[in-house]
Regions:
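Extracytoplasmic/secreted cell-surface and envelope-processing proteins
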Residues: 61-64, 103-107, 172-180, 202-208, ...
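Von Willebrand factor
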Residues: 37, 44-110, 115-165, 173, 203-207
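Bacterial N-terminal signal peptides
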Residues: 6-17
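Acidic/histidine-rich, surface-exposed loop or edge segments in extracytoplasmic proteins
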Residues: 45-60, 121-129, 189-190, 312-317, ...
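VWA/integrin I-like adhesion module and closely mimicked acidic/polar interface patches used
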Residues: 170-215
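C-terminal "exit" segments of structured domains
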Residues: 214-216, 220-311
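Loop/turn elements at helix/coil->beta-strand transitions in domains of secreted/extracellular proteins
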Residues: 47-49, 89-93, 157-164, 188-194, ...
Length: 330
């Protein structure tokens, strides 16, 4: 495997399959349109992890969705602890929902919610926007869309880990699209298909979820999406919330996306805090990592990573309180 040893892949999938703890409180779905047009990840010379999440949003999957919302940040923290050739890989995440009868049958009940992006607040926003509705769960169809619609990095590039994680609870071979055709297609492009069955281990094997992973050179996991993990308050909770507020005060939104992104950041803090205490603090930790990429809208991060030159900034793109100020490189 050109990216790293197989144990790394197992660690990545293990982090994702920690979707085994139900948050203590559900957050009501919000009405947000799919973020189909998102900032394209910046071209980087270093290592990359591309992660496509394919989530079943049929009636029985409320627990899975709420787990994914809060566990996103644990995944980010796991990714940020990985170093390849001394560099932390850039994490790009995409999101699909499938199996929802609110999506047209002509589309095989499959919907792209978010293309590959490094803006994890957009991913979080789309997760909180998901709602469940009974439908037909076609794993082959959603694999087809993810493998052909997303911009996967080519196999000629070194130090790239390409992952699909698909989660659900109906037979993996539902529908007319043969999943084996697409797992074979994925292997040729060095994209690994990992499956998470929401139910007993043997049931997942019987309904071909393990076969889906094996044929896609990935890993099979099973979870109880209704397991409830207790939330334990600590003496540090209030202090961590205050530190998060202080951190938020260091972001300076600029350009077309600045104000919108600051508002999104605030809303995702609120949604994550109301869904799960542990999930919220995982998010706070993620915000201090390199994989919480804000350079496309935050002036401080943009200057720090070299994507913005202060002398090139149009003062009209800055918040009003910063317009007309001079700057110094000292």
């Amino acid at each position: 495997m050109p990216f790293a040893q197989p144990v790394l892949l197992l660690a990545v999938v293990s982090a994702i399959s920690v979707l085994s703890a139900q948050p203590r409180a559900l957050v009501e779905n919000i009405d947000v349109a799919p973020a189909l047009e998102v900032p394209s990840p910046e071209n980087v010379d270093g290592p990359i992890i591309q992660l496509a999440l394919l989530l079943d949003t049929s009636n029985s999957m409320d627990g899975l969705i709420n787990q994914a919302r809060t566990r996103l940040w644990s995944i980010v923290n796991e990714m940020s602890a990985i170093a390849v050739a001394g560099e932390v890989p850039q994490l790009q995440v995409a999101l699909y929902q499938y199996g929802n009868s609110g999506i047209s049958a002509a589309e095989d009940h499959v919907q792209l919610r978010c293309r590959f992006t490094t803006d994890l607040d957009i991913v979080s926003e789309q997760l909180f926007a998901l709602s469940t509705k009974g439908g037909n769960e076609y794993c082959g169809a959603v694999l087809r869309e993810a493998l052909t619609e997303l911009s996967w990095v080519g196999t000629g590039r070194k130090h790239v880990l390409r992952l699909v994680v698909i989660a659900g609870n109906e037979p993996f071979n539902q529908g007319t699209e043969p999943f084996g055709e697409w797992t074979s297609h994925a292997m040729k492009r060095d994209i690994r298909i990992n499956t998470i069955f929401c139910g007993p281990e043997q049931e997942g094997r019987r309904t071909l979820w393990e076969q889906g992973a094996l044929s896609g050179n990935g890993y099979y996991a099973f979870i109880n999406q209704d397991y409830q993990e207790p939330e334990i308050e600590t003496p540090f909770d209030d202090a961590l919330k205050q530190l998060n507020d202080a951190l938020n005060g260091t972001y300076i939104g600029y350009g077309r996306r600045g104000a919108e992104s600051l508002k999104r950041q605030e809303m995702q803090d609120q949604f994550n805090a109301s869904a799960s205490v542990s999930g919220f603090f995982s998010r706070v930790l993620s915000k201090s990592s390199s994989n919480y990429a804000t350079g496309s809208w935050d002036l401080v991060s943009g200057v720090e990573d070299g994507s913005i030159a202060l002398e090139d900034i149009d003062s009209k793109s800055l918040p009003e309180e910063y317009r007309g100020l001079s700057w110094s490189s000292a």
